[in-house]
Amino acid sequence: KPKLGKLESVIMGIIGAKPLVDLMHAEAEANWIQQNEPEIWQQVHNFLLLSGYHNYKLTGNYKDAVASTVGFIPFDYKTQEWADQKDWKWRAMPIRSEMLPEVLPAGSVLGEITEAAAEQTGIPEGLPLIACGSDKACEVLGTGCIDNETGSLSYGSLATLNITSDKYLEAIPFYPAYPGVIPNTFNIEMMIQRGYWMVSWFKKEFGLQEEQLAKEKNLQPETLFDELLAKVPPGSDGLMLQPYWSPSNGDGPETRGAIIGFNEDHTRAHLYRAMIEGLTYALRESKELLEKRTKKSISRLVVSGGGSQSDEVMQITADIFGMTVLRPHNFETSSL
């Protein structure tokens, strides 16, 4: 357990931060390695996230982008620097400050491609490697979400709603706003775990017909699911789905999803539409919470991710949010 002092533990409990302390201690990868592979942890010289490891292999430098620094690590997301040595995070995991890379804002030079990396990758030797950001931070920027009045909806395996702010603000107390790709900005995020992963779940459990037909027509099965949505009226004839297959936004581990309102007339098409509607209503709730926290109205929504390829899904999104929604020509906005 984190080695917190008695007074510190009491304060954490009073302000409601103790569950987050326990979560970080339980989920930090460094703790797992130390506890399950102690002989490996004893040999650890540097502790890098995946982006930092790639940077090291390409340049030989222990450097990473500020906007890539997302995880269970001793990072101060408000100052966008490694946490002060007095911070409790250092006592929640075995990482020492000398193990961590230097972090630089997006646009900074992390180093140059080494001879060895050039031989292995074909990238020209000496080419500067520029700091950028995490996949989500790049996706938010790619949708043009550069202020707190534009919402970036991501319809991926993890469904999210992000806004960008120049002020640090936690949508859920003690859950940080992560660094944006634009220096000195923050991405304030709400998420639905197992979001559009549910489409994969539906395909596996109920989509054999679409899978077989898609194979014959050389299509993706998901493109045929639009026909199911079109068969069912808005509201799914009373069938409702609560999309919390996994806890989201600080919910407790007891959180579960629910499908409510079945009758003899409901079909798998009703289930699919209820699933899409339930996800969208959960994201609308996230929008309303963000607006309440920031005291700003989100006047523009841009949608990316695999789910945005569906015209029916986009129409459902517009109807439930009650506003025009936009999608880029390329749904993989992280690459933009």
Predicted regions and their residues:
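Glycine-rich phosphate-binding/catalytic subdomain of phosphoryl-transfer
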Residues: K1-E216
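A generic structural signal for residues located within well-ordered alpha-helices
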Residues: H25-A28, R194-W197, Q220, D237, ...
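Short glycine/threonine-rich catalytic loop with a Thr-x-Gly-x-Asp
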Residues: G133-S134, F331-S335
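Conserved catalytic-core motifs characterized by acidic clusters
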Residues: A171, Y175-P176, Q220, R256-G261
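Glycine-rich, charged/polar anion/phosphate-binding loops
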Residues: T185, L224-L228, S246
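Short, well-structured alpha-helical segments that form the helix of a local strand-helix-strand
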Residues: K217-V232
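Activation-segment/catalytic-loop signature of the eukaryotic protein kinase fold
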Residues: K231-T333
